[in-house]
Amino acid sequence: MAIKSYKPYTPSRRYMTGLSSEDITAKPSVRSLLVKLPATGGRNNNGRITSRHKEAGAKKLYRIIDFKRRKFGIEGKVEAIEYDPNRNCRIALIAYKDGEKRYIIRPNGLNVGDVIASIDEGSLDIKPGNAMKLRFIPVGTIVHNVELKPGKGAQIARSAGGYAQLMGKEEKYVILRMPSGEMRQVLAECMASIGVVGNEDWANITIGKAGRNRYRGIRPQTRGSAMNPVDHPHGGGEGKKNSGRHPVTPWGKPTKGAKTRRKKASDKLIISRRKGK
């Protein structure tokens, strides 16, 4: 997907880039697949900030995405490629032969008019958009929209340009190389879709101006060293003085290199950590 630049009629637009919308179908969204989501602004039910640097952002409706892909044995035709304000990849509107319509994450190579399907037992053609259980997918295949628990819906490789690779099979598990580089066992009964999530150039765009992040619901981040001692462990001092300690969060926990991953029962399924760690 092409990256476009903008005419610099203001200084902030000079280095701003965006993504071309040539692939988007000029067609309204399906109203039955749109729902309202409450904008919390990072606050809980008491109105207190529980997640900093968040706000409502621009108004948007949530598109209901089919992450389970369990409509077995019925072919569907790609009716439209649409923009989704809630995620960084495009979505595809699938019209099934029984009349139902659903949105799915659009992989690279899936275009209007293509026919896709999901299958419970057996395998399908290895082409973008088809979905099947991991145990029927050949070793070496690139997949996305991968479940971690059968029937729960996809949790892995859903972001723009994301994918996992099937590296091997052992009894009731398959071995996946995750987007992070981690090698992990996943139950062979889990569903996965073929291909790489589209819109991979999203990682290369330049935001260019603060207002664009505000549209996305991202508020400015204040450095701890610019605060007072009452507000942050790095705060205080005369002038631009360093904090005199290892970097910590506002609550005093180590950061920038400190491990934050919790121990879970499923850790035993990890064969090797990400990037060879």
Curated annotation (Swiss-Prot):
Function summary: One of the primary rRNA binding proteins. Required for association of the 30S and 50S subunits to form the 70S ribosome, for tRNA binding and peptide bond formation. It has been suggested to have peptidyltransferase activity; this is somewhat controversial. Makes several contacts with the 16S rRNA in the 70S ribosome.
Signal peptide stretch: none
GO molecular function: rRNA binding; structural constituent of ribosome; transferase activity
Pfam families: Ribosomal_L2 (PF00181), Ribosomal_L2_C (PF03947)
Domain of life: Bacteria
Biased composition (Basic residues): 256-277
GO biological process annotation, one example: cytoplasmic translation
Start and end residues of each stretch annotated as Disordered: 219-277
Stretches with biased composition (Basic and acidic residues): 231-241
Quaternary assembly: Part of the 50S ribosomal subunit. Forms a bridge to the 30S subunit in the 70S ribosome.
NCBIfam families: rplB_bact (TIGR01171)
Gene Ontology CC terms: large ribosomal subunit
Family, as annotated: Belongs to the universal ribosomal protein uL2 family.
Name of the molecule in the record: Large ribosomal subunit protein uL2
Keywords (A to Z) from UniProt: Ribonucleoprotein, Ribosomal protein, RNA-binding, rRNA-binding
Gene symbol of the encoding locus: rplB
Keyword Iron-sulfur: no
